[in-house]
Amino acid sequence: MVYKLVLLFCIASLGYSVEYKNTICPHRQDYRYWYFVAELTIGVNYDINSTIIGECHMSESYIDRNANIVLTGYGLKVNMTIMDTDQRFVAAAEGVGKDNKLSVLLFTTQRLDKVHHNISVTITCMEMNCGTTKYNSDLPESIHKSSSCDITINGSCVTCVNLETDPTKINPHYLHPKNKYLYHNSEYSMRGSYGVTFIDELNQCLLDIKELSYDICYRE
């Protein structure tokens, strides 16, 4: 009888010990597995003609369950935060497309879909047409997605912004480091798209990432 009571106690203790708890990925400088979480396209009203090696710099942090990345390059500062999340940013790359469009590839430790997230993006003009806040509102979504996104644009250099989350395509010519492994969403219905434009139709802000060359943003 005593043996049975001890066994029941052990089973109950084991069941209690595996109760779900929130955890996060430990901080590393050399994550090997990159998930392609978002592609951000930004149009500007000054000339950017080609991808420049070493132009983009990045810093990332994870504080109070908020994942943040800050990118600088091509006259812009891009600050993105994913709120209340277990994931963190691991890398980014930037490339220049036609008609003065900048494409930003963002990589994290896991995907966005099936979990509601609040995403905040701030884009600041650093060199040309700097000035007061031009736009501060929710970023309209053109494809239904569970995440919500707000954007702030400081300065008048930005002509359009398009954000695609959990993209289903990744540039096959993107030259990522050989010791990294890239993953991306394969379910078309789970991707999201948000955009705003100031001078052109929004579809003019879309780029075929297969036509671009990218350079990885250097960590600061």
Curated annotation (Swiss-Prot):
GO terms for biological process: symbiont-mediated suppression of host NF-kappaB cascade. GO terms for cellular component: extracellular region; host cell endoplasmic reticulum. Residues 1-17 form the signal peptide. Glycans are attached at residues 49, 79, 118, 154. Keywords: Early protein, Glycoprotein, Host endoplasmic reticulum, Host-virus interaction, Inhibition of host NF-kappa-B by virus, Secreted, Signal, Viral immunoevasion. It is found in: Host endoplasmic reticulum; Secreted. Induction: Expressed in the early phase of the viral replicative cycle. Glycosylated by host. It holds the Pfam family Pox_M2. Plays a role in immune evasion. When secreted, inhibits T-cell activation by preventing the binding of host CD80 and CD86 to soluble CTLA4 and CD28. In the infected cell, may inhibits host NF kappa B activation. Homooligomer. Interacts with host CD80 and CD86 when secreted. Belongs to the orthopoxvirus OPG038 family. This is Early protein OPG038. It comes from Monkeypox virus. The lineage of its organism: Viruses, Varidnaviria, Bamfordvirae, Nucleocytoviricota, Pokkesviricetes. The gene is OPG038.
